[in-house]
């Protein structure tokens, strides 16, 4: 068993509480936490102070935002789950899409088209919710992931100066697998 404690600042209360439970479970079962725990963080010293050995600390830049973190060391658990070859292919696909969004003309640019459709649906058609209903159990957590991503990225009602936005922000995301959502 390997516990990967992932926290950008290594101060997130809920994450550290869960990590503490894992650490206690390991100790209660005669396993040294330093042999079964790793950390992914932008603050190596805090992970080290918490007891994670240097060789098991995977760093990423402090400027990496949550919505982009999968492509950094935060993707460690994904890489373990799907294998390094598949993870490398996923990174290559993301890179290809990044290049497309940067270089494609607006009329053919999938990122621009999808973004404009979201603005159209939310602001002009007044579609305030978005249902996500995967019909494959392997995607059962996709709605929850999309909710978190949407709220982190677009769920704000004020701008950086704290002033109310002139237009509605992103829609409310909801859903469950298949017929449960209907």
Provide a role label for each language-model segment.
Residues 18, 25-182:
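Active-site phosphate/pyrophosphate-binding segments
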Residues 1-26:
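Well-ordered mid-protein domain cores that form the structural environment of catalytic cofactors
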């Amino acid at each position: 068993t390997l516990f990967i404690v992932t926290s950008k600042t290594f101060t997130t209360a809920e994450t550290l509480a869960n990590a503490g439970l894992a650490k206690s479970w390991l100790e209660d079962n005669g396993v040294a936490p330093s042999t079964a725990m790793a950390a992914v963080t932008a603050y190596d010293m805090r992970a080290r102070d918490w007891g994670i050995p240097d060789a098991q600390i995977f760093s990423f830049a402090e400027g990496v935002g949550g919505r982009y973190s999968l492509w950094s060391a935060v993707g460690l658990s994904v890489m373990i789950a799907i294998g390094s070859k598949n993870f490398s292919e996923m990174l290559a696909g993301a890179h290809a899409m990044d290049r497309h969004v940067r270089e494609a003309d607006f009329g053919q640019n999938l990122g621009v088209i999808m973004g404009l459709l979201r603005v159209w649906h939310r602001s002009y058609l007044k579609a305030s919710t978005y249902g996500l209903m995967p019909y494959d159990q392997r995607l059962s957590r996709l709605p929850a992931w999309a909710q978190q991503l949407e709220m982190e990225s677009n769920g704000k009602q004020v701008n950086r100066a704290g002033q109310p936005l002139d237009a509605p922000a992103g829609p409310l995301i909801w859903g469950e697998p298949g017929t449960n959502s209907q």
